[in-house]
């Protein structure tokens, strides 16, 4: 874990995401396991979050997003590369993001994961940038963007327009996680195609294979 911490700190500093800090703030470091089995360094900002005035910008309801897809036959899914890290922190707020680790005291120059207002801030930015296409040919939830169309010709044009808009705003997508010109895609935990929404097979299997619940805490955890 220490080796992984050292590597991730080095990658963040080399990439220009963090810098050494002399800030009086010093949040602790945590490690979170990702779906692919690797670990991601996160900062425990609970103390800072408790003092933060909350940004009430609403996150969209997933069921309302899916309602927009009726009649669509072509789909493109874009995943922004390290989405939060594409937003710079205001110079006056950089010191507040400082964290301590075994290998030094650092602060973020870009928006880190774990800040209470990070989702609302990112959602607001995405809505501002993609406003011309929202609910017409695009739905977006945080760093996941779905372009949907009824014809291939319209879809190709709309994909080009969205990519150009992202380029103009200096937002980068992660190519390995993008799916272009598809008849079916996975998006926000569902399989989507021209026939509608479908529960993903692995999620159904997980529910079917769940052991019998006998305690209130087990039921609460399942829900």
Would you name each region that the model predicts?
Residues 1-223:
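Retroelement reverse transcriptase polymerase core
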């Amino acid at each position: 874990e220490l080796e992984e911490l050292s590597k991730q700190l080095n990658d963040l500093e080399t990439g220009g995401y963090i810098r050494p800090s002399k800030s009086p703030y010093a949040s602790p470091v945590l490690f979170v396991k990702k779906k692919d089995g690797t670990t991601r360094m996160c900062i425990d900002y609970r103390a800072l979050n408790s003092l933060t005035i909350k940004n009430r910008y609403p996150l969209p309801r997933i069921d309302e997003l899916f309602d927009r897809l009726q009649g669509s036959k072509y789909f493109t899914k874009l995943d922004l590369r390290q989405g939060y890290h594409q937003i710079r922190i205001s110079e006056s707020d950089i010191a507040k993001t400082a964290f301590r680790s075994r290998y030094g005291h650092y602060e973020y120059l870009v928006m880190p994961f774990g800040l209470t207002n990070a989702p609302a801030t990112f959602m607001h930015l995405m809505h501002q940038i993609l406003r011309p296409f929202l609910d017409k040919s695009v739905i977006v939830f945080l760093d996941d963007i779905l372009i949907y169309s009824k014809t291939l010709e319209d879809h190709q044009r709309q994909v080009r327009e969205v990519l150009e808009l992202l380029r103009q705003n200096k937002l980068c997508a992660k190519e390995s996680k993008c799916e272009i010109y598809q008849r079916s895609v996975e998006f926000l935990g569902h399989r989507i195609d021209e026939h509608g929404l479908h529960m993903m097979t692995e999620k159904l299997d997980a529910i079917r294979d769940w052991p019998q619940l006998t305690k209130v805490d087990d039921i609460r955890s399942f829900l």
